A protein has these predicted regions:
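Short, small-residue-biased leader/transition segments that mark boundaries at the very start
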Residues: 2-9
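Hydrophobic faces of well-ordered beta-strands that scaffold small-molecule active sites
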Residues: 6, 31-37, 57-59, 86-89, ...
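Active-site-adjacent beta->alpha loops and helix N-cap segments on the catalytic face
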Residues: 10-24, 41-45, 61-85, 91-99, ...
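Long, charged amphipathic helices and adjacent flexible linkers at domain junctions
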Residues: 12-36, 76, 281-293, 297
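Solvent-exposed alpha-helices and their adjacent loops that cap or buttress functional pockets
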Residues: 23-30, 49-51, 78-81, 99-102, ...
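Active-site beta->alpha loop and helix N-cap motifs at the rims of alpha/beta catalytic domains
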Residues: 30-50, 54-56, 63
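Alpha/beta catalytic cores of nucleotide-metabolism and tRNA/nucleoside-modifying enzymes
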Residues: 36, 81, 125-156, 161-302
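Catalytic cores of alpha/beta
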Residues: 42-49, 92-110, 160-175
């Protein structure tokens, strides 16, 4: 038979794959992409997103424990069966997780009010500490798996301030993390880089802020004049390129895992020992009782 060329591999492609061995690609060698949907116009939005090439969908809402999410998931299953992966959330307890898992969610997001630009707890008084919510939901996930044989991954959404918080969330049971402020700081973020008081910053705002006006994520109906903000419009300190920063963050996560004697996330969750610490313990965990050199720029050698 006549031989035909199947594909062409360029040096640049090989170098890119070698430099980024963990990249997630589809069968056409495109990056996997997720898209958010709401529980209002999903019947028009979801087909359009899938036609555009979205690989996974997630119902984007501040409150996932609702019949609206159940109806949205049911519609997706009716139209596409199990061929379309769709996550749901957000929830903060066992009941919320079990509700979405039984509804057919492929993964569940955990966290209400813990995001850096979210003020849902301040304005409505609902939410829960991220660690408490995550531990309870992950226990419910394991309970559901033992009872049904179906494993529904959990995403920790919110509360990540320092890199070690990523490792803590994974150790508490999260299968993966959602990061907003972390990525908003980088060149790749589509927002503007501006100078504020001599420091470069990147714009960052919540979907519930007046600027975004994404009331479909939060609104329960009623007159528009009754809508109120559940997010803020803010700046985050500019941090340079995504590649360099993610590499450092991943190195820190791996280093902590090694300290725990773990070579994988499941092993970390098995071996990590979580303990409650006091405020003084947190202070003593950093530098203290010294004057940092970078805080005293005008040093004269005597």
């Amino acid at each position: 038979s006549r031989r035909q060329r199947q594909m062409c591999i360029r040096d640049r492609d090989y170098a890119s794959h070698k430099e980024n061995p963990l990249e997630l690609l589809d069968d056409q060698k495109r990056y996997l992409v997720g898209a958010g949907v709401n529980t209002r116009d999903y019947q028009e939005r979801i087909p359009a997103l899938l036609a555009a090439g979205a690989d996974v969908l997630c119902i984007d809402s501040s409150e996932g424990y609702s019949c609206w999410q159940e109806k949205t998931i049911a519609w997706v299953r009716e139209q596409y069966g199990d061929s379309v992966k769709i996550g749901a959330g957000n929830v903060v307890d066992r009941d919320g997780f079990l509700f979405l898992a039984k509804a057919g969610a492929d993964f569940v997001k955990v966290g209400i009010g813990g995001g850096s630009i979210c003020i849902t707890r301040e304005t409505k008084g609902i939410g829960r500490g991220q660690a408490t919510a995550l531990i309870e939901v992950c226990a419910a996930r394991d309970e559901y798996y033992r009872a049904t044989g179906v494993y529904v991954p959990v995403c920790s959404d919110g509360g990540i301030v320092y890199d070690y918080h990523m490792t803590l969330a994974l150790a508490m049971g999260a299968d993966f993390l959602m990061l907003g402020r972390y990525f908003a700081r980088f060149d790749e973020s589509p927002t503007a880089k501006v100078m504020v008081n001599g420091v470069y910053m990147k714009e960052y705002w919540g979907e519930g802020s007046n600027r975004a006006r994404n009331w479909q994520r939060y609104d329960l109906g009623g007159a528009g004049k009754l809508s109120f903000e559940e997010g803020v419009d803010s700046f985050v300190t500019y941090a340079g390129s995504l590649h360099d920063n993610v590499e450092i963050s991943l190195y820190k996560v791996k280093s902590t895992m090694c300290n725990c004697g773990a070579l994988s996330i499941p092993e970390l969750q098995q071996k990590a020992k979580l303990t409650v610490v006091s405020s003084p313990s947190i202070v003593e965990g950093g530098s203290h009782d010294v004057v940092l050199k970078n805080a005293t720029p005008n040093i004269i050698n005597g």
